[in-house]
């Protein structure tokens, strides 16, 4: 069934560029975009429905390409500790941080995790998100990682959004493997990944490359295991120090390397040559009160696509608005509003391997878009908080209006 969506303007991101169509029209046929362009050039057709968008601005549906939305427990107490001057590393060394969430997640039932994640994700969906990634990594044993990944798959069946599932078993060292990091990495590679991938629960594999997590050599073993299973890889890299994890990710043609505050010029060059997306996470930068900025100019020089994500997690970025991350990326990291919009649409799609069907308004792609009641697209990065009036469309069907 063909629908005509008209009386609107569009920021299409067509062809990987920030492109504007004034007085636009968009035609959908089933769940796909059939035509988009200036309304004056609209070909005649027999449309089953004509929808007046009242001068709204259309953008591709927003994509949150890095979240940890499934977890048990609450770490607001650590927020208070950090305000008193305790560092992230000190909290982790005392048994807090990821370890405390692991305990709570292991104790929670699948139904409890499903219900709590749904509550967290509803604000993101109302914010215009039509696709997102959710990582495991708070289970750190086979049964608990399986539980998390099953919840992620169930969320994908229930939410009006495309959900990608990433296995982050190499997130931290579980207590039962204290002092035996190499043994745990071997367990991930020989047992956990084959089992979880064999059950169809994994779309990609991630790891945390940092002094308080895993070394580049250990991460590489995980990447090799993922490659043998035919799974793409991603990496938390250069958040707190420079271990050149982003260059390692580039060598394995990773979909993305994320955080990147301490990456070097050579790291940026490697990522640009490999086509690995840089995922910027300003929420964690802000909450941890970091001062080392990601090298945005180096990323630009080497043509590295920059995505932006919420990093929704209980410890370092309890962020429930992807649109707020646009403002943070512009204000803290000095991205332009155009770069920020591309970062939560086209480049975010690339960071998840979804760019063939998501991330821009082009013929043949899924009709996932948002109709915003704004005067110009830069307002998406300008307004702080609130729920901008909008209509969220997924697969050519309205899923939210507010």
From Swiss-Prot:
Pathway connected to this protein: Amino-acid degradation; L-histidine degradation into L-glutamate; N-formimidoyl-L-glutamate from L-histidine: step 3/3
UniProt keyword annotations, A-Z: Cytoplasm, Histidine metabolism, Hydrolase, Iron, Metal-binding, Zinc
InterPro entries in the cross-refs: Amidohydro-rel, HutI, Metal-dep_hydrolase_composite, Metal_Hydrolase
SUPFAM superfamilies noted in UniProt: Composite domain of metallo-dependent hydrolases (SSF51338), Metallo-dependent hydrolases (SSF51556)
Record protein name field: Imidazolonepropionase
Catalysed reactions, as listed in the record: 4-imidazolone-5-propanoate + H2O = N-formimidoyl-L-glutamate
HAMAP family: HutI
Single GO MF annotation: imidazolonepropionase activity
Lineage, broadest ranks: Bacteria, Pseudomonadati, Pseudomonadota, Gammaproteobacteria, Pseudomonadales
Residue positions binding 4-imidazolone-5-propanoate: 75, 138, 171, 239, 316
Cofactor binding notes: Binds 1 zinc or iron ion per subunit.
Originating organism: Pseudomonas aeruginosa (strain UCBPP-PA14)
Superkingdom, natural source: Bacteria
CDD domains recorded: Imidazolone-5PH
Binding locations of N-formimidoyl-L-glutamate: 138, 313, 315
Biological function: Catalyzes the hydrolytic cleavage of the carbon-nitrogen bond in imidazolone-5-propanoate to yield N-formimidoyl-L-glutamate. It is the third step in the universal histidine degradation pathway.
Family statement drawn from the similarity comment of this UniProt entry: Belongs to the metallo-dependent hydrolases superfamily. HutI family.
Cofactor(s) needed for function: Zn(2+); Fe(3+)
Positions bound to Zn(2+): 66, 68, 236, 311
GO cellular component: cytoplasm
Residues binding Fe(3+), per UniProt: 66, 68, 236, 311
Localization in the cell: Cytoplasm
E.C. code: 3.5.2.7
GO annotation (BP), single: L-histidine catabolic process to glutamate and formamide
């Amino acid at each position: 069934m063909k629908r005509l969506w008209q009386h609107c303007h569009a920021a299409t991101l067509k062809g990987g560029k920030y492109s504007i169509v004034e007085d636009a029209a968009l035609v959908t046929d089933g769940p796909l975009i059939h035509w988009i362009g200036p309304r004056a050039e609209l070909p005649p057709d027999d449309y089953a429905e004509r929808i007046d968008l009242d001068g709204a601005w259309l953008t591709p549906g927003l994509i949150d390409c890095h979240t940890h939305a499934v977890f048990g427990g609450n770490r607001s107490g650590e927020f208070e500790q950090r305000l008193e001057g305790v560092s992230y590393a000190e909290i982790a060394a005392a048994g807090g941080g990821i370890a405390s969430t692991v305990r709570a997640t292991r104790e929670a039932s699948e139904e409890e995790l499903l219900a709590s994640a749904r509550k967290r994700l509803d604000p993101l969906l109302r914010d215009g998100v039509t696709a997102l990634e959710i990582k495991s990594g708070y289970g750190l044993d086979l049964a608990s990682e399986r539980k998390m990944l099953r919840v992620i798959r169930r969320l994908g069946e229930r939410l009006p959004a495309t959900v990608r599932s990433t296995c982050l078993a190499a997130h931290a060292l579980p207590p039962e493997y204290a002092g035996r990091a190499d043994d745990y990495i071997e367990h991930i590679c020989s047992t956990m990944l084959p089992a979880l991938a064999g059950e169809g629960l994994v779309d990609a594999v991630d790891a945390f490359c940092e002094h308080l997590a895993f070394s580049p050599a250990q991460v590489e073993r995980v990447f090799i295991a993922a490659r043998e299973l035919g799974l793409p890889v991603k990496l938390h890299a250069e958040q707190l120090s420079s271990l050149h994890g982003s260059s390692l990710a580039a060598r394995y043609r990773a979909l993305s390397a994320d955080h990147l505050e301490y990456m070097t010029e050579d790291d940026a060059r490697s990522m640009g040559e490999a086509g690995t997306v840089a995922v910027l996470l300003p929420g964690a930068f802000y909450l941890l009160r970091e001062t080392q900025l990601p090298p945005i100019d180096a990323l630009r020089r080497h043509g590295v696509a920059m995505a932006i994500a919420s990093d929704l997690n209980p410890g370092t970025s309890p962020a429930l608005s992807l649109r707020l991350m646009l403002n943070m990326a512009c204000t803290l990291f000095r991205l332009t509003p155009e770069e920020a919009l591309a970062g939560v649409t086209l480049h975010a799609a690339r960071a998840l391997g979804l760019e063939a069907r998501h991330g821009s308004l082009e013929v043949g792609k899924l009709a996932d878009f948002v109709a915003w009641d704004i005067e110009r697209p830069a307002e998406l990065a300008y307004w702080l908080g609130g729920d901008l009036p909008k209509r969220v469309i997924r697969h050519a069907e309205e899923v939210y209006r507010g």
